[in-house]
From Swiss-Prot:
<keyword id="KW-0677">Repeat</keyword>
<keyword id="KW-0479">Metal-binding</keyword>
<keyword id="KW-0539">Nucleus</keyword>
<dbReference type="GO" id="GO:0016020">
    <property type="term" value="C:membrane"/>
</dbReference>
<feature type="binding site">
    <location>
        <position position="2"/>
    </location>
    <ligand>
        <name>Cu cation</name>
    </ligand>
</feature>
<dbReference type="InterPro" id="IPR002460">
    <property type="entry name" value="Synuclein_alpha"/>
</dbReference>
<keyword id="KW-0186">Copper</keyword>
<feature type="compositionally biased region" description="Basic and acidic residues">
    <location>
        <begin position="95"/>
        <end position="105"/>
    </location>
</feature>
<feature type="modified residue" description="Phosphoserine; by PLK2">
    <location>
        <position position="129"/>
    </location>
</feature>
<keyword id="KW-0007">Acetylation</keyword>
<feature type="region of interest" description="Interaction with SERF1A">
    <location>
        <begin position="111"/>
        <end position="140"/>
    </location>
</feature>
<keyword id="KW-0963">Cytoplasm</keyword>
<comment type="subunit">
    <text>Soluble monomer. Homotetramer. A dynamic intracellular population of tetramers and monomers coexists normally and the tetramer plays an essential role in maintaining homeostasis. Interacts with UCHL1. Interacts with phospholipase D and histones. Interacts (via N-terminus) with synphilin-1/SNCAIP; this interaction promotes formation of SNCA inclusions in the cytoplasm. Interacts with CALM1. Interacts with STXBP1; this interaction controls SNCA self-replicating aggregation. Interacts with SNARE components VAMP2 and SNAP25; these interactions allows SNARE complex assembly and integrity.</text>
</comment>
<dbReference type="GO" id="GO:0007268">
    <property type="term" value="P:chemical synaptic transmission"/>
</dbReference>
<feature type="binding site">
    <location>
        <position position="50"/>
    </location>
    <ligand>
        <name>Cu cation</name>
    </ligand>
</feature>
<feature type="modified residue" description="Phosphoserine">
    <location>
        <position position="87"/>
    </location>
</feature>
<dbReference type="Pfam" id="PF01387">
    <property type="entry name" value="Synuclein"/>
</dbReference>
Amino acid sequence: MDVFMKGLSKAKEGVVAAAEKTKQGVAEAAGRTKEGVLYVGSKTKEGVVHGVTTVAEKTKEQVTNVGEAVVTGVTAVAQKTVEGAGSIAAATGFGKKDHMGKGEEGASQEGILEDMPVDPDNEAYEMPSEEGYQDYEPEA
């Protein structure tokens, strides 16, 4: 029985030693895992910050582009409105067509008001002659 007890004692010592080594190995592995996780986390954070910065910069560029497009669109609409108003004024006899809608092309818009029939007493406007009108027949 002594041999048996001695064998169990040695086995116990081996298990204790193995457990110590395992505990030490697990602690070391846990420490390295923690370092690895922290490293990956910091790199991910840097990547996220860089990614967010990049997205923010691209968004800013797109907003600028959209803003420029809106301004361009509004300018085009305003120009077409002026041209349309000029055509209407010319068709109704309130101005000369060659003076209307040429402000952006560099032609002066001076003289437009002088060509308009204006009543100084603000009582009534003189109707243009019917020579400039065409008969309108609605489509059926």
